[in-house]
């Protein structure tokens, strides 16, 4: 999987040590991608509804976007009937939010809702191989 992710000049960074590298890339106007459908850490991330159930969700994309005025864009590929994949991008608006706990939670809700809408539109194309709801909300 990492070979596939890095074959077009991408770099994969370890999540535990990524903060400095991610901030540096954002400040250099380089794109940064997060796998936002993965479960977060229940001790440092936040719970928001995903597919009707509370799920611990990474807050870092919202925190970085609000702190650095970097856009959040959901990207996904859909297989068309002819077997060709179409890549689609959807920007998540957040001009009305500030970098507060409430603002970060609201932006996280928005990007999770956008992901959920994509999955509901193309459920047969969602490749899901992990426990998204492995932690109970407090």
Predicted region positions:
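Non-catalytic C-terminal accessory region of glycerolipid acyltransferases
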Residues: 16-138
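Membrane-interfacial amphipathic helices and adjacent loop/beta segments
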Residues: 1-16
């Amino acid at each position: 999987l990492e070979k596939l992710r890095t074959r077009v000049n991408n770099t994969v960074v370890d999540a535990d040590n990524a903060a400095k590298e991610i901030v540096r890339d954002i400040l250099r106007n380089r794109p940064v991608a997060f796998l936002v459908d993965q479960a977060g850490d229940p001790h440092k991330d936040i719970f928001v509804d995903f597919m009707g159930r509370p799920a611990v969700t990474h807050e870092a994309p919202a925190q970085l976007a609000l702190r650095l005025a970097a856009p959040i864009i959901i990207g996904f590929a859909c297989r068309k009937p002819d077997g060709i994949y179409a890549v689609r991008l959807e920007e998540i608006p957040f001009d009305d939010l500030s970098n507060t706990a409430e603002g970060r939670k609201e932006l996280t809700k928005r990007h999770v809702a956008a992901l959920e809408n994509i999955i509901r539109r193309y459920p047969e194309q969602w490749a899901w191989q992990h426990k998204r709801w492995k932690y109970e909300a407090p």
